[in-house]
């Protein structure tokens, strides 16, 4: 439990973070963590500040430490997965995103990112299997249809792939007389 003074500092740091004054927020969060080194909200928000400043290694360390203290924090799991994804570290992102989906399986955005990581790593069979399952849960998801369609093209299943790409992007096949783009 934190005292009133620390709570006041935390709110000050949050104000800096929201106003994109990340260096100031970092200073305050670090001061809080000197007194309360195992305070997940301070670690998590410090990681967000580092991420915004493109200090990826520092952000990663904060998220990992946060998860060591509170392993069930789905927000920290998702943000660590997002950090890896946004920095092109798809192999590192996959197990983190998988952990997130085990914690809560109906996260549509996490499912999209997981599918894209599989796609970027050219894991065609895994993309195929994963997207089939995901599209049963989210049949209108255009991003999943796009990854699945592109993956089907990679697998030389061109007709099926084109069908999913048409559904997801509104592409028009040559030779169609009537077409509609939503």
Q: What residue ranges belong to the model's regions?
A:
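Structural marker of alpha-solenoid helical repeat scaffolds
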Residues: 35, 69, 103, 137-138, ...
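Canonical positions in the second alpha-helix
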Residues: 31-32, 65-66, 99-100, 133-134, ...
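Register position in tetratricopeptide repeats
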Residues: 18-19, 52-53, 86-87, 120, ...
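Alpha-helical segment of the N-proximal tetratricopeptide repeat
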Residues: 5-35, 41, 48-52
């Amino acid at each position: 439990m934190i005292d009133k003074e620390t709570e006041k500092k935390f709110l000050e740091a949050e104000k800096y973070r929201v106003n994109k004054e990340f260096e100031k927020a970092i200073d305050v969060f670090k001061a809080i963590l000197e007194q309360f080194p195992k305070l997940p909200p301070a670690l998590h928000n410090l990681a967000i500040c580092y991420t915004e400043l493109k200090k990826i290694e520092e952000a990663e360390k904060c998220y990992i430490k946060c998860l060591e203290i509170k392993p069930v924090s789905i927000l920290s799991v998702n943000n660590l997965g997002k950090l890896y994804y946004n920095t092109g570290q798809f192999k590192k992102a996959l197990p983190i995103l998988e952990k997130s989906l085990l914690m809560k399986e109906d996260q549509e955005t996490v499912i999209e990112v997981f599918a894209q990581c599989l796609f970027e790593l050219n894991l065609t069979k895994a993309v195929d299997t994963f997207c089939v399952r995901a599209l049963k849960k989210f049949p209108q998801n255009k991003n999943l249809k796009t990854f699945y369609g592109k993956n089907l093209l990679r697998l030389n299943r061109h007709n099926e792939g084109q069908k999913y790409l048409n559904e997801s992007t509104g592409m028009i096949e040559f030779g169609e007389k009537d077409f509609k783009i939503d």
